[in-house]
A protein has these predicted regions:
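A short, aliphatic-rich beta-strand micro-motif
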Residues: 192, 230-239
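Regulatory sensory and allosteric helical modules in signal-transduction proteins
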Residues: 42-46, 166-169, 176-215, 219
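PAS/PAS-like sensory domain cap-loop motif
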Residues: 4, 14-26, 177-180
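GAF sensory/regulatory domain recognition
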Residues: 8, 74, 142-145, 154-187, ...
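PAS-associated C-terminal cap
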Residues: 39, 85-89, 95-115, 119, ...
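Short loop/turn elements at sensory-signaling interfaces that couple input to output
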Residues: 2-4, 77-95, 162, 241-244, ...
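PAS/PAC sensory module
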Residues: 61-65, 70-79, 84, 94, ...
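Sensory-domain boundary capping and coupling elements
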Residues: 78-80, 95-97, 196, 237-252, ...
Length: 289
């Protein structure tokens, strides 16, 4: 960039990353600004403004996302520094933009895994202290949302009635009336083939990766989108005989949120919860005997 902030040279590598050519960047001084992710644009603009104002005094670093021509999202590590000629005159600024998307994704995955480990630990602690089943279910849902960062969690009892109802008994997070209108069943019907109904019917964990495209989520798609749900996982709570008597269902605000490592941790959490419920019920029977 020259001292006024206009681009004078751009690396050919910019096209491989952004989809826009050298000529396009040089012809449109605002192109770089426009392709910065909207959530990161204020920070980027502030950085550029400070860089120009400070001139030779500022060396800067900032991470931000860009939206490429094809719609792909990339994390950029940006560094810039002043260029000074031998006489001490300020010539402008040189900047380097490096694609660090893989590192950012790995960092985010590690942070999520750590949150889930904390949630698993906190749920285990709540289970050990529990004296009331309903409170344990509520506490588990709350911890899953608050500690692990999920959008909503609920537990539904698998009723053995004619309609094969899954009855919500505890929840936390962004629910906003979703459960009262979901009409989830574990029958082999349209409203029983989503994650919760299938987990109740089969006794196996079920993941719905993307409410936007997975056909199993179609009956709830509009209501899910209104609340920000993009993917979900349903984990059966199994009794001693192995049959599902309840289901823990969790919703995330992004698609494909439930990787294998995440699923394993959440299954451990559900298993601990199930053992806690069995222990409380066994104690209740002894008290009433």
């Amino acid at each position: 960039m020259d001292p006024q902030g206009a681009l004078v040279q751009v690396s050919p590598a910019c096209e491989r990353l952004s989809g826009y050519s050298q000529d396009e960047f040089l012809a449109d001084p605002k192109l770089m600004e426009r392709i910065v992710h909207p959530d990161d644009r204020p920070r980027f603009e502030q950085h550029i403004a400070h860089s120009h104002a400070a001139g030779r005094l500022l060396e800067g670093e900032i991470d931000f996302r860009i939206i490429a021509r094809d719609g792909g999202e990339h994390w950029i590590a940006h560094t810039c520094a002043a260029m000074i000629d031998p006489s001490g005159s300020y010539l402008g600024r040189a900047a380097c933009n490096m694609d660090v998307s893989r590192y950012k994704l790995a960092e985010e995955a590690l942070l999520r895994l750590n949150r889930e480990l904390v949630a698993t630990r906190d749920c285990a602690s709540a289970t050990l202290r529990a004296t009331d089943e309903q409170k344990l279910l509520r506490d588990t849902c709350r911890i899953v949302c608050n500690a692990a960062g999920y959008l909503m969690a609920w537990v539904g009892i698998v009723e053995r009635d004619e309609c094969k109802t899954v009855r919500p008994v505890a929840w936390s997070g962004v629910e906003d009336g979703y459960l009262s209108s979901a009409n989830i069943t574990w029958a082999d019907s349209e409203r029983g083939r989503g994650p919760t109904g299938t987990a109740a019917r089969t006794g196996e964990t079920v993941v719905l990766d993307d409410y936007a495209s997975d056909p199993e989520g179609q009956p709830w798609r509009a209501r899910a989108f209104q609340r920000g749900y993009r993917s979900s996982i349903a984990i059966p709570l199994r009794g001693p005989a192995g049959d599902a008597y309840a289901v823990l269902t969790i919703y995330a605000d992004r698609a494909h949120a439930f990787a294998r490592s995440t699923t394993r941790l959440l299954e451990e959490l559900a298993e601990d919860l199930s053992l806690g419920i069995e222990s409380l019920r066994a104690g209740s029977k002894l008290d009433s005997a």
